[in-house]
Amino acid sequence: MGVAVLENGSLLYHGVETFRKLPSPQDRLKQGRAAVARLIRDFRPAVLVVEKTFIGKNRNAALLNVLGDEIAALGRRHGIAVVSLAPNTVKKAVAGYGWATKAEVANAIAARYPELKAYLPPGRKWKQQRHYNMFDAVALGVACLNASKSRGPHNSHCQIRAP
């Protein structure tokens, strides 16, 4: 799971939360909830941005859908505004068009935040890297910030205040 914390356009934290493969989906969800609760406690965000999930036909996709819903619910329980953005919306905001590849999104993010260039994979080895989740998380934050700038401070929940 990619994680990014932005404040006023500055990248304060970025990373990937990894979870052990546990036999039970409930145990994996519990791990995810615990990680998100820890991040909320550590960073105290004003806004939590999650990617809109898709309807998948396999067990992993279903688990991701449930985890996305759990993350949003956990944020609301902590009084945090929750914004859900579709992948194409994020890609358009970051890379200029909605059908951008993960590599194109990552390159656009690395151009904005040069400290992330070290995480760009060489050549075509993109799917072998775990960092694409981190780039996705930063892209979600950037898309949310861009939306708040275009709508004005009073018309968007994507305002990032002190974490």
Language-model segments: residues:
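Phosphate- and other anionic-substrate recognition elements at nucleic-acid/protein interfaces
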Residues: 1-163
